Amino acid sequence: MFKGILLCVLFAVLSANPLSQPEGFADEERDVRGLASLLGKALKATLKIGTHFLGGAPQQREANDERRFADGQQDYTGWMDFGRRDGQQDYTGWMDFGRRDDEDDVHERDVRGFGSFLGKALKAALKIGANALGGAPQQREANDERRFADGQQDYTGWMDFGRRDDEDDVNERDVRGFGSFLGKALKAALKIGANALGGSPQQREANDERRFADGQQDYTGWMDFGRRNGEDD
């Protein structure tokens, strides 16, 4: 729209050519000025209308600006209040959280104190129980000395037992030697007894031959006896 108005003004200026009609220059100049004034007023009115259409009158724009500023101020104030409330709430929350932490610390100290009390009580109870089971410290010391003496005695006993084992080994070798001697003596005695009962080897051989002859004779006698019995039958 503005471009159309400017083109109209330019066309009006170009159409007012003073060289074409020099005799009527004053009249035409007044006409051009009147037309230009008319176009200027029209342009101003158009601009005013457009301005009012877009943003209203200057007073309206000022009022709008003030209203917008007031709205912006209100928004800013609202955001500030919101941020302040949030900050206050956060601060209050942190204060409450810190207060709860302090209370938790107090409770924790109470619990630790009670735990320390229980620990001391348990330690005292264990000490009393230990004294009851093992006696007083002097009694426990005496028991320890007695146990050490018993251990020393056991150690000495094991040493003696080992020493006795070595002595038993020696005695065992002696017994084995004496047993071997007895075995040899018994063998010799049996040999002597066998010789005494059956005579010398030559005599035993003669006895064996005699016994064989007697057996052969007995066998022959039995054969003859059987043969005679068969003939009799």
UniProtKB/Swiss-Prot annotation:
List of residues that carry Sulfotyrosine: 76, 91, 155, 219
BP-aspect Gene Ontology terms: antimicrobial peptide biosynthetic process; digestion; innate immune response
Keyword flag Repeat: yes
Q: Annotated region Disordered: where?
A: 197-233
Modified residue annotations for Phenylalanine amide? 82, 97, 161, 225
Q: Lipid metabolism as a keyword?
A: no
Propeptide residue range(s): 27-72, 86-87, 101-151, 165-215, 229-233
Residues spanning the signal sequence: 1-26
GO MF, one example: neuropeptide hormone activity
Summarizing the function annotation, the protein's role is: The pharmacological activities of caerulein are quite similar to the physiological activities of gastrin and related peptides.
Q: What is this protein called?
A: Preprocaerulein type-4
Organism equals: Xenopus laevis (African clawed frog)
